[in-house]
Each structure stands twice: as C-alpha cells, then as structure tokens.
Amino acid sequence: MSQTTTNSASETLGFQAEVKQLLHLMIHSLYSNKEIFLRELVSNASDACDKLRFEAIDQPGLLDGDGELAIRVDYDKAARTITISDNGIGLSRDEAVANLGTIARSGTREFFSQLTGDKQKDAQLIGQFGVGFYSSFIVADKVTVLSRRAGLAANEAIRWESDGQGEFSIAPAEKAGRGTDVVLHLRADEDELLNGWKLREILRRYSDHISLPIRMAKEDWDAEKGEQVKGDELETVNQANALWTRNKSDITDEQYREFYKTVSHDYDDPLAWTHNRVEGRSEYTQLLYVPKHAPFDLWDRDARRGVKLYVKRVFIMDDAEQLLPSYLRFVRGVIDSADLPLNVSREILQESRDVRAIREGSAKRVLSLLEDMAENKAEDYATFWTEFGQVLKEGTGEDAANRERIARLLRFASTHDGEQAQTVSFADYVGRMKDGQDKIYYVTADTFTAAANSPHLEIFRKKGIEVLLLSDRVDEWMLSYLREFDGKSLVSVAKGGLDLAELADEEEKKRQSEVAETFKPLVERLQQALAEQVKEVRVTQRLVDSPACVVVGQNELSPHLLRMLKAAGQEAPEVKPVLEINPDHALIARIRDASDAEFGDWAALLLDQALLAEGAQIADPAAFVKRLNGLLLKA
C-alpha cells in the first residue's frame, strides 16, 4: 500500500493491489445479488459488538456505562445514503488502515489465480473468499466510515472515505460514542434501497438470526404526503436471538441457509447441516454446516479454518480449529459451550478436557450427517465427495476411533465401470466379490490413466476380479493406516508375490508349477544379467498382454510413494524391484532364444519398458533408445 498525500489533518493512501482487483471483480460479478451488502455490513457490526463484549470481560471499563449493544440501520432519501451503525469495539486509525485498505490473509494469491472471467464461477469464488466490507461498493459510489475505538477519547475517532477507485482518505474526527457508522452514498440507479420496507425485508431475509437487536426508525403512513414517514421511536426488525439457541422446529430451512452465509461468508447455499443440543459430560450446542464447494485455500496450511466458538452465547473467537479434527476442516458453523471459561484462550483449548469431548462429539455428528447423505441423498454425497473426498481420507490416519465409519464413507474409481469418477464404496466392492475371494485388491498410480492401464491389472480383468484404482496423493498415506475392511485385507496388485490360489482350479495350479520349472533357466539368466538393477526375477501369473512388470515386496514402499517422497524433497530409501515375466508372451520366447551377444540388451530393454509401464523414469533414456534401435534393426 502506497501513501500519496499527507497533511496534518488528512492523508490519502492507495489501496493494496489485491483490494483494487477485488473491488473491480466484485462490482461486476456480484451485482445480481447486490443485497448481500447489507448482510455483510450487519454481520461486521455484530462481530464488532461480539468483540467488545469479549474484551470487556477483562476490561469492563470499555463499556463506559453503555452495555446495551445494538445495530441501527437508517436511510436518508434527500442525501441518498444508507447508514449502518453499531456501538461495538470500533476502529483505531491503524486498524482502519489495516482492515479497510488491505486484505490481510493467507491464500490471496491463490484466490486470484483461480478466477476465470466467468461471472457465475467467479461469484462463487468471491463468496468463498469473503467480500465483507468491500461489498459496500456494489451499491455505493462512495463510502464514509466514522469510527471510535472503545477506550479512546471522543477526539481520537477517525473518518475513512473512498470512492472505491484505488485510493482512500483517513483523517482525525470527533465522535460522541464508541463504535462505527458506515455511510453508503448510493449509486444513481439504487433508489429502490431508499425505502424502509425494502431495507426491513432484506434484513429479515438475511439477518433475522443476528443475536443483537437491529433497529430502525418506526414508520407511519402520512396521508398528506402519501408516503411512510419516519418517527423518533426505534423498533427492532429482527428476532434478535441467536439462531442456534432456538428450537429446530422454529427454524425454517431458509433461515438455516442464510445463517450459514453469514457465518461462512459463502455466496452459495450449504450442502447439509446438523443442529443439536448436547447434554451430559459436556454441555454445548452445535450448528454445523457442510459447504457445497471447497474453499480455494483448502490445502493451505496457514489458512483460516474451524468454527465460531461461543461460551454461554458470548462470542469468544473465530476459526476455533481445536473443536473439530483437521480432516473435517471444511466444516463451518457455531459451537456454543456452557462449560468453558469466558476467558478461554487457544492454549487452554488445546489442553481442555471439555474441548476434547466437544471435538469427539462434533466429529461423530458430522460423520452421521455424511452417512445420512450417502445413504439418502446420493447426488449430494457425490458433490461432497468431489469437493472434499481427499480431505476425508485423511481421517483414516487422524481418527482411529472413527476409522471404520470413515472407511464406509470413502469412494474410489474401479475397474468395475472404468470411469474416473470416484463412486465405488468398499461395501459396493465387497458385494461384488467373486466366490472364494477374500481380499480387496487395489492399484496406486500417479494418475487415473496410469492406474487404469497398469499391466498389473491384466490377470484381474481376465478373471473378472474388480480392482480399485487409486490416484489421489493422499491414497498411499491412507493405506498405511487402513489395512482391512469388514475383515478383508486390502492388497496391492503391484506388491509381493501375487497369490490367486483361492481362485485357481487344480489344473491351473499344476500348469503354473510346470511353467515355473520350464522357465527356470531363463529366470536365472535374466537374474544374472540384471543383478545390479533388480532384487529378483520370477515367472508371474499376473500378466496376460504385457511381457513383464515390476513389483516390490509386500512391506516395501511402493514406487508411486517413493516418487512422491522424492518430489517433496524427502529422503526415500533405494528399493530394488522384482522383475516378473509373462511366460506366454512372444517377446519372452524371443529373449529365451537370444544369443549371448544380444541377451544383455534384451534383458535391459525388458526391464526399462516394465519400469515405464509402471510410471517410473528410466535411468538412461539415451541408452534405452540406442538398444531399442539396435534390436529393431536386427529383427
């Protein structure tokens, strides 16, 4: 942010570059839903009052005899202004510059990089990012903020002003009481907002759940003027009690949706929600939502996450990540505890037994919500899985107590339909298992295409055995914790000596034994030629169309995981693969008859192509091409 003009009374500063970009995008992308400006500004006013109430726990003098917190909305037809006022914590000069001139949050660059130019898609992203105060400029061509922070003198107030074009001014001001007035100077085409009925309708639709009273001047019909006229008496236009404290039967779905948009600053409706009052060892109320879209910063370790924490209806903090496990970090909402102390800190949250009980109970409640969605709203669950499936997979390692429940919620691609969409559950797989099959088979790879085309699948396709196709980065980590489902082991088709004995008849078993003996000389010859590169060479039953493949030991890291570790700059052990050959392939017959002079090249070529098929990089591509060309010329 750059300073452009300064004098003793006022200074003009430039908006942070990201703010300029956001203002432009927001005005053009969100205009069709312009009424959210009032929701956002009322939400900010409510937050300011919550913060004052919290700070006043330790500093009661901040209330200065005015403990009745409220929000007021007013309009002036002649001046063409709407004013949103609160008597909350207020802003100092430095806070005004930081909060109204910059976007001080992580993930800003990632947010802008995801914008597409498509108004509808960008509107959703902007909603996820949270437009807050800047939504004022959707309907206003100038915004004035008069604010005095609690604890400061009347002459220490500030006046902030901007037309949203790139700069703002800030100057000292006088203000009788603490709090903030946001004055919107409306654009020429926004006359419909200069109407008490219209403003009340917007407030009741978007902000009825705000726990503070929202007040407007009472209006009566003036027959002489032929219009509603404001009087001196104020009336409360919202219900003014926290939504989560009401009985569920008294809350409409629309009210639940609007509350979600307020606490999450999301532009879209939630996918699902759960509202419960818990009594017993720990007493608390939870209103938790599953969003419809993943936030752009879902994978940002420094991103804000967690739910709002209240204690006995007193706001304590945003983003209380300790109240839910990390794998449920996409959940938004409110938890109101009756047991935690009002002066609770983040450090206390980490150590509190009550918080552990809340976290465990909330995790179970969210999992129940997802189970219900998976069973009764398949389309909604498919949307959830597309957005948050990879995050939920983390729960298999993070939440041992709920691992089995999480496993039932997982979805995968599989050879059953060959589609990339992850729609197959473990229960689906088990329900389709062959007679005599007692294992769940899977393959991991860098991409879905690589997994679907893996040579390790050939025998399974031939026998009609389903294999799960895993290509998410989190899958290998998940599998290190998830070893079985419903008593059936999870087995990689690319690890160890594949044992399909339970699916083979006696004649097939006899043939396999005879083939292994017949090809023993070739196996020994290949083992000698490739002694530096492979741990073992053996005949396999897992191949049908490919001449060879590489596998690793049952307890060794998979090649896919080794590549991920190396790409992340972490140390990875050197693992020699096992080369398995297909005795029925014509190329193996050709190598079996190769002269000693050519055998070394054939052996190296066989290993390199097996590595390439697995997704690995070969050590010397130039040598590979040279060998290939030489052997082709001799063919």
UniProtKB/Swiss-Prot annotation:
Report a single Gene Ontology molecular function.
Answer: ATP hydrolysis activity
Subunit annotation:
Homodimer.
Keyword field contains NAD: no
Q: Which InterPro entries match?
A: HATPase_C_sf, Heat_shock_protein_90_CS, HSP90_C, Hsp90_fam, Hsp90_N, Ribosomal_Su5_D2-typ_SF
**Which PANTHER family does the entry mention?**
HEAT SHOCK PROTEIN 90 FAMILY MEMBER (PTHR11528)
GO CC, alphabetical: cytoplasm
Region called C, residue ranges: 564-635
Main localization of the protein described in the UniProt heading: cytoplasm
Q: Which UniProt keywords apply?
A: ATP-binding, Chaperone, Cytoplasm, Nucleotide-binding, Stress response
Q: Where in the cell is it found?
A: Cytoplasm
Spans annotated as B: 347-563
Write down the HAMAP family for this protein, in alphabetical order. HSP90
**Protein family membership:** Belongs to the heat shock protein 90 family.
Query: Where is the segment annotated A?
Result: 1-346
| Protein name listed in UniProt | Chaperone protein HtpG
Q: Which PROSITE patterns match?
A: HSP90
- Which interval of the chain is the signal sequence? none
Report the function annotation for this chain: Molecular chaperone. Has ATPase activity.
| Transmembrane portions of the chain | none
